[in-house]
Amino acid sequence: MDLLRQYNFKIADASPEYLERRKKQAVLFMTAAAVTIFTSRFAYKSTITRQYIPTLFQGNHSPPLGYNFTSDAAVAVGTGTMLCASVSSMICFGTCWVLDVSTFREFGWKMKSLMGGTQKEQELADMPMDEDSAYIQDGLNDILDGKVELNFDDE
């Protein structure tokens, strides 16, 4: 930490909870990256082992007799799904790490602030309300506050 303070890094003054949170986000991203590397290596190995290399005088236009298209398709779908899931998780965890997001609610707040939602909300709140909307809002507030008693039994 003294080295970080020496070079004037702001993270040197961060709370231990913040440092632990950032460490957790980094570990999630690194784990997803490791899973992506292992999955891509598995996909490469499974592709190489299924590769058909004909002998010198065999035709290379038809697969061997013991070839099973169903199992090959199942392996391809499984491998593609694993690759897609691992890369997607790596992108998701990396984005959350960069944006310092740990929950879906924080993600919503961060996106709202990045897209100017708080400014638009403030502008909308500052606009004057028309008479009909104010009447409806006051009526609903009276009902919620218990100032109006609704009697549905009388006809």
Swiss-Prot record:
The chain crosses the membrane at residues 27-44, 77-99. It comes from the Eukaryota. It is found in: Membrane. One of its GO terms (cellular component) is membrane. The keyword Ubl conjugation does not apply. Keywords: Membrane, Transmembrane, Transmembrane helix. It is a multi-pass membrane protein. InterPro entries: AIM11. PANTHER family: ALTERED INHERITANCE OF MITOCHONDRIA PROTEIN 11 (PTHR39136:SF1). Belongs to the AIM11 family. This is Altered inheritance of mitochondria protein 11. It comes from Clavispora lusitaniae (strain ATCC 42720) (Yeast).
